[in-house]
Structures are given as C-alpha cells and as structure tokens.
C-alpha cells in the first residue's frame, strides 16, 4: 500500500474519505473488495483490478479505515470535483435520467443501510427541488455542494 503525506489533504478531503468509508463499511468496521470499489467511486476515484488483486494476495478479505486511507489518499488531490460528483451520481443511476426511489433503495440495500421507505421518500422530497419525484444531476450536485449547518 502507498504511504502518503496527509499534509497534502485538506480537512474536508480527510472528512470525505472517512464519510465514504463509513458509508460502505460492513458491520465488522471494514471494507471488502466490492465495498472498496463503491467507496472509491463515491470519492470520484477508480481503483484498479491489479490493486484489488494485491489486497487479495496479501490474504486480506477486508481492510480497515487506515488501510483504506493509505490506499485512496494519493488519488484525492488529482481528481476534479465536478467529475467526482458526476461519478457519485452514476453510482445511483445508470441511465443518467435521475435518482428514483427504486435507485435509492437499491443503493441502500447494496451498502447495508437499513432505511424505511418513508425515510427514502423523505430524502428524495428534500433533494427534489423541481418536484418531479426524481433527483436529477443538477439537484444532486446542488445537494452535495451545500454546506451542512448544524
């Protein structure tokens, strides 16, 4: 695995890596190979099959946050933020038309997130600013670039 200088990453980038890891991790607190791929894509990065094979050859069935951080952090400064958001959008929908309830439910199931149908509909309603029942790319980008205020 690649060692990196965390000084090259901003606090926001480090938080983003942690959020991606937390979103896809298993109950054991680690990522398996499929979850690693999803977490990379959510960050707008692509992991090579060769890298995944190296992980397997080391006998690892899953990796910890520290290993994931070392693996993904060299990719973070090189990515373009708009293409990152477009990659994340594509995680939800394959045809590019928008994120539907069905798409959101499928992703929730794939990442092991237990959400009620009501919660999923609330998420869509919150992000769907034009009221058509679908989260289009611009709504998704707007949602993802809005600072959370707590």
Swiss-Prot record:
Keywords for the protein's UniProt record, in alphabetical order: Calcium, Cell cycle, Cell division, Cytoplasm, Cytoskeleton, Metal-binding, Mitosis, Repeat
Location of the EF-hand domain: 12-46, 80-114, 115-150
GO CC annotations on file: centriole; centrosome; cytoplasm; nuclear envelope; nucleoplasm; nucleus
UniProt name for this protein: Centrin-B
Binding site for Ca(2+): 128, 130, 132, 139
Similarity section: Belongs to the centrin family.
Signal peptide (UniProt feature, chain positions): none
Additional notes on this entry: Binds one mole of calcium per mole of protein.
Entries under CDD domains matching the protein: EFh (cd00051)
């Amino acid at each position: 695995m690649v060692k990196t200088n965390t000084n090259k990453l901003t606090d926001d980038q480090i938080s983003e890596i942690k959020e991606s890891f937390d979103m896809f991790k298993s109950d054991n607190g680690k990522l398996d190979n499929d979850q690693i791929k999803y977490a990379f894509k959510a960050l707008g990065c692509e992991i090579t099959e060769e890298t995944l094979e190296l992980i397997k050859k080391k006998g690892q069935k899953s990796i910890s946050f520290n290993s994931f951080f070392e693996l993904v952090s060299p990719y973070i400064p090189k990515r373009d933020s708009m293409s990152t958001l477009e990659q994340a959008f594509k995680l939800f929908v394959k045809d590019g038309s928008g994120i539907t309830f069905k798409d959101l439910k499928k992703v929730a199931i794939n990442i092991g997130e237990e959400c009620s149908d009501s919660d999923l509909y609330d998420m869509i309603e919150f992000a769907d600013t034009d009221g058509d029942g679908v989260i289009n790319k611009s709504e998704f980008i707007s949602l993802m670039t809005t600072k959370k205020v707590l």
